[in-house]
C-alpha cells in the first residue's frame, strides 16, 4: 500500500508537467480483453472515437487550458508497455484462467503506442477525436477521459489554501467511509471498482480502492483498473463494452445484418473467451429488442450487465427472460454498474440477492464524489457525465440507442433507421447525472 498525502501533493504541485497517465495499464481491463478480440477479428477496421460531454452546462473549453490538455495527451502518446507489465499480463491468472493473453498479442503490445488525436474548441467545449485502426483508437477511451476529468479537478483546486485542501479531502474520505460502513451490512455483497474513467484523479482512485479493500474485505472483489490490480494484488475485473455491437452494427450492409449484428460479435467474443467473461451487455440498441431476437445460446451465457434501463426493471425483465428459456436464474449472474451508489446498491441487493447471483461495479460515485465537500461551497468538483464513444466505422456513422434516449449517440438519420429496425420498446428518458 502506498500512502500519499494528497492534499499536500496538490498544494505543493509546481512541476512543468505532472503526468496524469503514467502507464498504459492505467485503463479498464475490458479494453485489453476487447483489444485482443478486435485484433483477431477486425484488424483493418478504421474506427473513430469522440469525447462527448453530456453535462453541457460545464464548458470544458473554458475550464481546461488547451495547452495543458495537449501536453497531457502528448505525454500519453510517449508511454509504452514495460517489460514488467507484459510479464505480469503473461503470467497472472485472470478469471481463474492462466495465459489469458496469447504470446502473439503480448509481443504486439510491446510495440503499441497511442495514435494521434484531433483537438479543437467549439462553443465552449472541446471536440476531441481519435481516428485510425480500431486496434489503436480503442485504447484512447480511458486515458482520454481520465485526463480531461483530472485536469478539470486540478483547475477547480487551483489557488485553494493548504488547510482548505486538507478539509476537502478529509470530508471526501469521511463521506466514502460512511458509504463503506453501510455496505458492510449487506450479506454476500460482491462489489468492484469501476471508477477509472471519471475519477477525480489517479491518486484519489488509488486511495479509494485501498480504503474499500480494507473496509469491505472479501466483499470487495477487485478493480477494473489494470494498474491498480497489479499494484494491489487485486482481481482485474471487466468483460466487454458498447463499442463491440456499435462497430458491428455500423458494418452491417442491410437491415437484416443490422438486426443480427449484436449477436454476431458476441459469437466472436465466445470464440475468444469463456466462463465468467460471458457477460452480455444488452442495451446498446435496447434491452427489449436484444432479448426479443437473441439466439438460444445467449441464454447459456453466464449473465448480463444491465446498463441504462432502470435497474430493478431491467433485472426483473432479464430474470423473466431466463425463466422463459428454461434457465435457473439462481445459476446466473447480474452485474449492475450504471451510476451505482450506496442507495441503489442496497435496493438492488435487497430485491435480487436471493434470486440471482449479484455483482456491482461502483464507478463515479466511488472515485469522484466530492459533492458537498468543498469548504467554499463550490460545485466545480461535482462529477460530470463525460463519455468517449465510437462515432464512425470505415466512414459510416455509428449509433448507440440505449434504454435511455438521453444516452443515445449518433447521426439523427441513422438513429431513426436503427429505431425502425430495433424498435423503441422499453426506452425511458431519464436525467443523466454521471
UniProtKB/Swiss-Prot annotation:
The modification Phosphohistidine is found at residue 242. It holds the Pfam family NAPRTase_N. Transiently phosphorylated on a His residue during the reaction cycle. Phosphorylation strongly increases the affinity for substrates and increases the rate of nicotinate D-ribonucleotide production. Dephosphorylation regenerates the low-affinity form of the enzyme, leading to product release. It catalyses: nicotinate + 5-phospho-alpha-D-ribose 1-diphosphate + ATP + H2O = nicotinate beta-D-ribonucleotide + ADP + phosphate + diphosphate. Transmembrane segments: none annotated. It comes from the Bacteria. Signal peptide: none annotated. It is an enzyme of class 6 (ligase). This is Nicotinate phosphoribosyltransferase. It comes from Bradyrhizobium sp. (strain BTAi1 / ATCC BAA-1182).
Amino acid at each position: 500500500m502506498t500512502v500519499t498525502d494528497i492534499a499536500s501533493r496538490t498544494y505543493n504541485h509546481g512541476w512543468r508537467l505532472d503526468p496524469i497517465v503514467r502507464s498504459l495499464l492505467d485503463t479498464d481491463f475490458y479494453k485489453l480483453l476487447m483489444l485482443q478480440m478486435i485484433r483477431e477479428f477486425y484488424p483493418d477496421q478504421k474506427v473513430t472515437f469522440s469525447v462527448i460531454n453530456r453535462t453541457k452546462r460545464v464548458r470544458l473549453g473554458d475550464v481546461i487550458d488547451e495547452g495543458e490538455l495537449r501536453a497531457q495527451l502528448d505525454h500519453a502518446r510517449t508511454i509504452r508497455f514495460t517489460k514488467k507489465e507484459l510479464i505480469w499480463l503473461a503470467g497472472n491468472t485472470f478469471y481463474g484462467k492462466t495465459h489469458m493473453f496469447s504470446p502473439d498479442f503480448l509481443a504486439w503490445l510491446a510495440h503499441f503506442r497511442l495514435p494521434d488525436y484531433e483537438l479543437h474548441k467549439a462553443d465552449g467545449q472541446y471536440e476531441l477525436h481519435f481516428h485510425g485502426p480500431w486496434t489503436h483508437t480503442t485504447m484512447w477511451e480511458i486515458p482520454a477521459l481520465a485526463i480531461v476529468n483530472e485536469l478539470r479537478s486540478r483547475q477547480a483546486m487551483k489557488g485553494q489554501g493548504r488547510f482548505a485542501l486538507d478539509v476537502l479531502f478529509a470530508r471526501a474520505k469521511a463521506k466514502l467511509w460512511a458509504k463503506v460502513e453501510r455496505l458492510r451490512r449487506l450479506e454476500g455483497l460482491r462489489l468492484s471498482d469501476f471508477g477509472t474513467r471519471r475519477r477525480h484523479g489517479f491518486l484519489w482512485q488509488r486511495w479509494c480502492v485501498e480504503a474499500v479493500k480494507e473496509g469491505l474485505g472479501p466483499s470487495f472483489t477487485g478493480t477494473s483498473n489494470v494498474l491498480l490490480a497489479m499494484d494491489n494484488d487485486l482481481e482485474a475485473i471487466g468483460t466487454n463494452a458498447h463499442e463491440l455491437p456499435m462497430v458491428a452494427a455500423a458494418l452491417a450492409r442491410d437491415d437484416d445484418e443490422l438486426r443480427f449484428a449484436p449477436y454476431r460479435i458476441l459469437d466472436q467474443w465466445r470464440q475468444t473467451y469463456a466462463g465468467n467473461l460471458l457477460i452480455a451487455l444488452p442495451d446498446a440498441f435496447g434491452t427489449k429488442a436484444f432479448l426479443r431476437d437473441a439466439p438460444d445460446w445467449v441464454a447459456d451465457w453466464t449473465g448480463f450487465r444491465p446498463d441504462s434501463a432502470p435497474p430493478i426493471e431491467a433485472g426483473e425483465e432479464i430474470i423473466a427472460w431466463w425463466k422463459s428459456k428454461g434457465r435457473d436464474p439462481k445459476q446466473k449472474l447480474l452485474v449492475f454498474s450504471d451510476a451505482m451508489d450506496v442507495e441503489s446498491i442496497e435496493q438492488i441487493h435487497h430485491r435480487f440477492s436471493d434470486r440471482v447471483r449479484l455483482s456491482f461495479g461502483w464507478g463515479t460515485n466511488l472515485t469522484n464524489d466530492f459533492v458537498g465537500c468543498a469548504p467554499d461551497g463550490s460545485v466545480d468538483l461535482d462529477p460530470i457525465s463525460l463519455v468517449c464513444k465510437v462515432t464512425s466505422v470505415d466512414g459510416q456513422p455509428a449509433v448507440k440507442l440505449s434504454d435511455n434516449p438521453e444516452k443515445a449517440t449518433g447521426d439523427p438519420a441513422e438513429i431513426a433507421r436503427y429505431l425502425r429496425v430495433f424498435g423503441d420498446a422499453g426506452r425511458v428518458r431519464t436525467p443523466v447525472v454521471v
